[in-house]
Amino acid sequence: MANNGVDAAMRDRVRQQLEEVEQRFNVKVLYACESGSRGWGFASPDSDYDVRFLYVHQPEWYLRVEPQRDVIELPIDDELDVCGWEWRKALGLLKAANPTLIEWLDSPVVYQQNDAVLAELRALVPQWFSPVRARWHYYSMARKNFRSYLQGDEVRLKKYFYVLRPLLAVRWVEAGRGVPPMRFAELLAGSELEPP
């Protein structure tokens, strides 16, 4: 797994959390990655760790008649925000071209993964990617972040990136380049913006 700026102690802590999830909920984590500013490539010293994972239950869970909860969310602490989606839910979201899940699959910070399963899942992305949905998702995100983060008298530099990144993703999609990369630097490099 690539390090990408996450120190060994934090990686160990994340892996320990994932092991606890597996034991507590009787699931198997197939994939775990970093989302948010660390995955986008512009974490600040006070950034938390947004750990996202995909998991499967034991076979008997899938034989129940009543629908079961398909999300695992741990209480957020000062450093860790850990949340996962059940595998069937993830497949449905991928089929619906969910940009958030597609970003997770492109994260440069991977804590653990089942290589064979993830290779098959990633191979589905190009056929289910929807430029229309991606454009709308990123445009809506930029608008929401602009309203939430850039309206005060003092704005932290990092908050501008929360607006710029989705706008660059919109440009990427509108240019017909396919799935936008998760990393801000890649989006910027591929944006073909003219210098001032």
Segments from the language model and where they lie:
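Short, well-ordered loop/turn elements at secondary-structure boundaries
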Residues: 27-28, 47-49, 157
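Helical scaffold of the NTase/Pol beta-like nucleotidyltransferase catalytic core
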Residues: 1-33
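Catalytic metal-binding acidic patch
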Residues: 36-77
